[in-house]
């Protein structure tokens, strides 16, 4: 349907609903509505279905597991000029990610809406270190797979490691939008 998000957005507003975000590539609207409004929206042919937002959970990762990743840089493949999109619990500006230059280019906090990079869980920072840590804190003993890539992080998971599916889908859409500019 043409103008799907706009026509349904108007209906949601007329039912006194609150639109949280739109994911236009998938024709998804995330909104808070009363139960009666949900039943009314289901009557429109452009609404395929309505579901409750679900939580996803981060998978566990321990430091001993992460340290088992062995990297050989004999081929001189460091990831220079490549951007990596991360949807996780955030990223702490650790020395291995910021020295001698900061490789955390994008940080969007969908949980607390803070403007600076942080990680209140640790999973995201661990993931970023495995991917792009340069080993400056360990005299190059522990380096990531591609230590020169830039990081584009969306914090979609909270300190307990849970995040809404809608935030994850929104993050994916934003990273796809940014892909040409940052070579993600």
Predicted regions and their residues:
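Short acidic, Gly/Pro-enriched loop/turn segments at secondary-structure junctions
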Residues: 57-62, 159-169
């Amino acid at each position: 349907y043409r103008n799907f998000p706009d026509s349904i957005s108007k209906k949601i507003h007329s039912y006194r609903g609150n639109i949280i975000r739109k994911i236009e590539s998938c024709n998804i609207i995330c909104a808070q509505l009363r139960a009666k409004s949900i039943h009314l929206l289901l009557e429109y042919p452009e609404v395929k279905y309505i579901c409750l937002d679900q939580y996803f959970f981060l998978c566990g990762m321990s430091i001993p597991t992460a340290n088992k990743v062995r990297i050989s840089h004999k081929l001189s493949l460091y990831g220079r000029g490549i951007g990596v999109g991360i949807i996780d619990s955030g990223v702490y500006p650790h020395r291995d990610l910021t020295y001698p230059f900061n490789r955390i280019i994008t940080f969007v906090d969908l949980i607390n809406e803070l403007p600076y990079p942080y990680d209140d869980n640790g999973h995201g920072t661990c993931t970023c270190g495995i991917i792009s840590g340069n080993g400056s804190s360990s005299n190059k003993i522990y380096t990531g797979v591609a230590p020169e890539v830039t990081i584009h992080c969306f914090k979609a998971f909270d300190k307990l490691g849970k995040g809404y599916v809608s935030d994850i889908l929104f993050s994916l859409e934003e990273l796809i939008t940014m892909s040409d500019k940052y070579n993600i």
